[in-house]
Design a protein with these regions (language model features):
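N-terminal carbohydrate-binding accessory modules
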Residues: 1-73
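Substrate-binding cleft and catalytic face of glycoside hydrolase catalytic domains
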Residues: 65-127
Length: 127
């Protein structure tokens, strides 16, 4: 059996903010349910890999976008980390550092010919 993918087929990758961005001092990110759970019971996480041990997309996204280019991706789906964007949900104050980060990621994807697809909720809530 031979199958020909359509010319406009989306070849890409996907990532979850909480699983790939990591936690960094000074960026204004608040705590979310996964951060809290990992602090309380790291042994419940496979090989104790938690928010502090990610692929660090937050710091290395430009390298990742270059890899997408090299491997022929034309799209990338990521999620917004609400605990980074609105660190304290009781105030609703938006973290400008997070806005700048997500805008830059989207701009870089577009600049490299990648279609950004954003997911606004992926099983993570602020505390």
């Amino acid at each position: 059996m031979k199958y020909q993918f359509p010319e406009n087929f989306w070849w890409g990758s996907a990532a979850s903010g909480p699983q790939t961005e990591g936690v960094f001092e000074g960026d204004g990110k608040g705590q979310n349910i996964w951060d809290f759970w990992y602090q309380e019971a790291p042994e419940k996480f496979f090989q104790q890999v938690g928010p502090d041990k990610t692929s660090q997309f937050y710091k290395k996204y430009q390298e990742d976008i270059q890899l997408m280019k090299e491997t022929g991706h034309n799209s990338f789906r990521t999620s917004i980390q609400w605990s980074r964007l609105i660190p304290d949900p009781t105030t609703g104050k938006v973290n400008q550092t997070a806005v700048d980060f997500y805008n830059q990621v989207i701009d870089d994807l577009l600049e490299h010919g990648k279609r950004p697809l954003d997911l606004y909720y992926l099983l993570v809530l602020n505390l």
